[in-house]
Curated annotation (Swiss-Prot):
This is Glycolipid 2-alpha-mannosyltransferase 2. The gene is MNT2. Residues 117-126 have a biased composition (Basic and acidic residues). Residues 35-138 are annotated as: Disordered. It is found in: Golgi apparatus membrane. Residues 36-461 are lumenal. It is a single-pass type II membrane protein.
């Protein structure tokens, strides 16, 4: 249809429609230059990488790299840097090289995970001087030793799982189990399944778990009755006395231990609070130590009324066994006149079996045993071990493991330094640490050994 028809139309609405269409056509033609604007092509064809600013390089390793950052960096949307520099309250994952911050814990001074691992402990670096893998040093002749009944199995496997997770999965040391009865197959199967090293099971000879011929059984019974009336812990127990005598004088004689020089005693229902990334056995051997402990405590005086007098008689008759530079001042406050009851808690001890096998200790135990004090009183293996170590060893042969984090019964040893607890994944509460409490002998040990107390100790005494 020709345009003239619209203009000549007699119908008014067609005339108006023609005017509108003409106006639109003129406007489009006069503004056609918009479609040729080069900016529109830039916007529609520019790749995303040019329109969105790239993040700055992560953690530049040199000043030159830092200077190459864009000048308008303050206008760029920041992205998180790599995990080692992430915000301290951000937890990304459980990788040991990507540690979240803990409130109150200072930043580590190490510049790399490798340096952090080297600074973790002097002991770890000493054990790895000839190896690139510090957790797999050359093993020593050592084993765990546990005295347990079949009825204690499920309390014991918790201890085993704990020790394996915190320490032995890295080192695979053997485990010797002893019992005054035959072990059940279930006991053997479960413990073998949990232990990463070899497991060995032994029955205690009857003569090591019974009354010697020289004991007056009636007198021993009267002692148990009297102690029960006095409400002395384990005062009426026969089995407890047999256990203390066995741990004092016979466990180290068992044939299953003949192949070993070192042992670590583990009991049911204990807890290891911290990761142990070095070989504690090898540390003892390399540093010429003999006896190691975690908790020191006072003994109940009513259980050992004549133990010290008997010990003094032995020393008087055998002065040659008293070591130079011994640790007498830890167990006596008056140069040996009386016993102050301090001892190392023997439910955790790492020690050299050859010390117990030696002449001095053998004669000392036999001397004590002949008096009947295990049955006429209630002598414990802990004070006997401790007195022997304090008298027959130079004090520098005794070692306090301040880094284990150990709990048995109601008493806990927990490292006091927050950074250490963080780095070693300790799950203990330092408020429960027993080391510097009143009933502990921790303060005396530090003072008499000439050691500097942790800077946090006053807060937890």
């Amino acid at each position: 249809m020709k345009p003239s028809i619209f203009y000549s139309s007699r119908q008014p609405y067609l005339k108006y429609l023609a005017i509108i269409l003409t106006t639109i056509t003129i406007y489009v033609l006069t503004h056609s230059s918009y479609s040729a604007d080069p900016n529109i092509n830039d916007v529609t064809t520019k790749p995303i990488s040019e329109t969105v600013p790239q993040p700055p390089p992560q953690s530049p390793s040199s000043p030159e790299q830092q200077q190459q950052q864009p000048a308008n960096q303050d206008q760029i949307v920041k992205v998180p840097e790599e995990l080692k520099n992430k915000p301290q309250d951000l937890v990304v994952d459980n990788n040991k090289d990507q540690k979240p911050a803990v409130s109150g814990v200072p930043k580590s001074s190490s510049s790399s995970p490798q340096q952090q691992e080297k600074q973790d402990t002097k002991k770890e670096s000493e054990n790895s001087s000839s190896s690139k893998d510090p957790v797999k040093p050359e093993k020593v002749k050592a084993t765990f030793v546990t005295l347990a009944r079949n009825s204690e199995l499920y309390d014991l496997i918790k201890s085993i799982r704990n020790v394996e997770d915190r320490f032995n999965r890295k080192f695979n040391y053997d485990w010797v189990f002893l019992n005054d009865d035959d072990f059940t197959q279930e006991f053997k199967d479960l413990t073998t399944a949990l232990v990463s090293g070899k497991t060995k099971y032994g029955k205690i000879p009857k003569e090591h778990w019974s009354y010697p011929d020289w004991i007056d059984l009636k007198r021993a019974e009267e002692t148990r009755k009297n102690m029960k009336l006095q409400k002395i812990i384990y005062g009426d127990s026969e089995s407890y006395r047999h256990m203390c005598r066995f741990e004092s004088g016979f466990f180290w004689r068992h044939p299953l231990l003949d192949d070993y020089d070192w042992y670590w005693r583990v009991e049911p229902s204990i807890d290891i609070h911290c990761d142990l990334n070095y070989d504690l056995f090898k540390y003892m051997e390399d540093n010429n130590k003999v006896y190691g402990f975690t908790i020191s405590i006072h003994e109940f005086r009513a259980t050992i009324p004549t133990l010290w007098d008997t010990t003094k008689k032995f020393i008087k008759e055998n002065p040659q066994y008293l070591a130079e530079n011994n640790f007498m001042d830890f167990i006596s406050d008056d140069k040996g006149e009386t016993y102050n009851l301090c001892h190392f808690w023997s439910n955790f001890e790492i020690a050299n079996l050859n010390f117990w096998r030696g002449e001095a200790y053998r004669k000392y135990f036999d001397y004590l045993d002949q008096t009947g004090g295990f049955f006429y009183e209630r002598w414990g293996d802990a004070p006997i071990h401790s007195i022997a170590a304090a008298l027959f060893l130079p004090k520098d042969k005794i070692h306090y493991f301040d880094d284990v984090g150990y709990k048995h019964s109601v008493y806990t040893q927990c490292p006091l330094n927050p950074q250490f607890r963080y780095e070693h994944k300790c799950h203990c509460n330092p408020d429960n640490d027993f080391t510097f409490r009143g009933y502990s002998c921790g303060k005396k040990y530090f003072e008499k050994m000439g050691l500097q107390k942790p800077k946090e100790w006053e807060k937890y005494q």
